[in-house]
Every structure is written in C-alpha cells, then in structure tokens.
C-alpha cells in the first residue's frame, strides 16, 4: 500500500507575500517586485519604519524595479536595467534611491556607493488606511506615469517619464512604417 504526499503543492502563507506588477509603458515596460507587509495594528512610519533610516521599501528582499528602456525617474536619467529601491522616510518628504544592487536582501547590505540616482518626493497624508503596502501605476500616458507607494496613512508619487523623447518618437515612427508595410504585403496576397 503506497502513500502519496501532496505537501509539495502547498506552502505556508507568508506574513509579507511577494507582489509583482508590470506596466506597459512607451515602447517597453516597467516591472516592480516587492514584499507586502501589513500594518496589523502597528504604527508604521516613525516607529516600525523609523524616520531618517534607510528602508528596503517593502519586506524581505529589497524592492526591485526594472526598466526596459532609458527613463527619467524623479527628473533624473536612468539607464535600462534592474535597480533596488531604497527609501529614507521623513515626516514630510522621502528620499528615494535607485541602487544598482537589485538583488539586495533588505537594507542590511545597502551601499550608498552603488546608488544610481537619489531624489526627494513630498509625503501625502491620506484619510483611509492602506493595510498592506501597495505599489501601483497611475496617471499613465505615452510619455509619463507615476509610481505610487501607499501604506498606512501615507502616499507618495514618483514621476517616471521617457528619456530621450526624440529617439522614442523615431522608434514609434519606424514601427508604424513596418506595420503599414505588413498591411501592404497582406493586401497584395489577396
């Protein structure tokens, strides 16, 4: 008589589950991978996440962001690639850092010498409780969008826009020409 184990199909629920969000943007996409801690009755900013200390922008492995084309984040140019997001929260503004160590575990190995860019954004206080940390994309257009971070009663907006607009415009024009060429070929086959 055999015994079959199904345990390999299940995992324990994580206290801070991973979330991956991807947004089609311009001629490519942006992906954010982060751990989603919850408030669970705790005071978050200023206590669990102290003011003035580097935070991994999530739980467990540092939050990462991937760009498949050059962009401007917070008004600063960033090459395509993978970056860790680190934040130094303050009561009225946050310092946002994109760091080259995209595989960092937490903020323990944070090295400011690996920073690609650094900028500040204002903190927006909200009326409604955001129980679990949430990253999202809002105000999307062909040329810009905002990466939103919400947790507890706090929200910040990180502006992202295409870099080197004239190059992207040329790529889009060439793609349109290729599509027209394909349509013309299909018409000749009939």
Regions found by a protein language model. Name each.
Residues 8-50, 107-189:
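Primarily secretory-pathway and cell-envelope proteins
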């Amino acid at each position: 008589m055999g015994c079959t184990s199904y345990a390999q199909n299940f995992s324990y629920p994580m206290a801070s589950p991973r979330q991956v969000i991807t947004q089609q943007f311009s001629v490519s996409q942006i992906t954010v991978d982060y751990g989603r801690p919850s408030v669970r009755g705790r005071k978050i900013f200023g206590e669990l996440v102290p003011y003035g200390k580097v935070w991994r922008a999530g739980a467990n492995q540092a939050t990462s962001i991937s760009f498949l084309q050059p962009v401007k984040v917070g008004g600063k140019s960033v090459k395509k690639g993978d970056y860790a997001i680190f934040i130094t929260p303050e009561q009225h503004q946050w310092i946002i850092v994109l760091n080259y160590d995209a595989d960092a575990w937490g903020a323990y190995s944070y090295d400011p010498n690996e920073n690609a860019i650094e900028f500040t954004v204002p903190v927006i206080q909200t009326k409604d409780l955001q129980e679990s940390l949430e990253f999202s994309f809002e105000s999307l257009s062909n040329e810009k969008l905002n990466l939103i971070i919400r947790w507890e009663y706090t929200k910040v907006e990180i502006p992202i826009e295409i870099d080197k607009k004239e190059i992207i415009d040329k790529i889009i024009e060439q793609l349109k020409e290729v599509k027209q060429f394909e349509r013309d070929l299909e018409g000749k086959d009939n």
